[in-house]
Amino acid sequence: PAPRGLCRGDKVGPLRPSMCGIAGIFRLPSARGLSAHELGTLVRTVAHRGPDGEGLTYLGTRDGALGEVTAEGDWTVGLGHRRLSILDLSESGRQPMQLGDQPLWISFNGEIYNYLELRAELEALGQTFRSHSDTEVILGAYAAWGTAGIARLRGMWGFMLVDGRRRVAVLSRDRLGIKPLYYRAWDDRLAVGSELKQLLALPGVTARADERALSEYLATGYEDPSRTFFDGLVSLPAGTYAELSLDTLRLSSPASYWAPERVQVTVHDADEAAARLRHVLAEATRIHLRSDVPVGCALSGGLDSSAVVVLVDQLNRREATPAPLHTFTATFPGEAIDERR
């Protein structure tokens, strides 16, 4: 069936959010404050991001090794997650997730589009997987390649990965910063979240303006990628990762794993350029369609979304049982912002 917009009276089921929510607390054994109750607050504050489940994991040192403990135990790492199921809808895909019996845990928001290719590569190296999720592939990539594995990911993400062997937590965001990751640091503890309001919900954190960030934005129109408009609340810059020592809670300076390159492209004529663009766009669209739930498209009156919808429809028609493609348009009749134009 051809793609079409939705009309009044159409029934397509409830609309779902397009994100998960992550939360984390890291603290020294001597730290006071930020208890299991506060981790629950961080998670509940973003309940709207993940309607499909909630998970909490507490980690502490036992016999010299990091492992799971109870909320009432002597924990120093708390990971939380609100789940929106897109890949592997079973309980095997729930988070926070551990990689088998290895001391690697993750809370992840986003989607890794090339997870099937990475999974095949990791299986060739001898790794086995318990789920069909992209989350487990991130853990596997880190186990195989360390932080160098981050550059192999194609997708959008914000995650916290805890490495019990190295006793570090790795925080990372995707190349363009599509998915957010914020944190608030004290001397003896650090809190992480997907949204600023999670951190603002913590005791002792006030919504005080960062006057320097505001003045720089008003003067230049640009934002510092590592700052927010709230004093003390920090954004991890896009395209970077940072390592947090679990023993000292010292956070490294963000390290870039990617930067756009200037590429010299040579084409002989407009037809060749169009063919190459179509190939690249079709390939990107194809891997973005990997999902275990129905996929829809936002459709405005512009060329970008129209081209994507046409490609999605063409790819969909190649399937044995094509699914209806629903498109969504923000319409404001008579207004300049009407997206049908």
Label each region the model flagged:
Residues 16-341:
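Cysteine-centered catalytic environments shared across enzyme families
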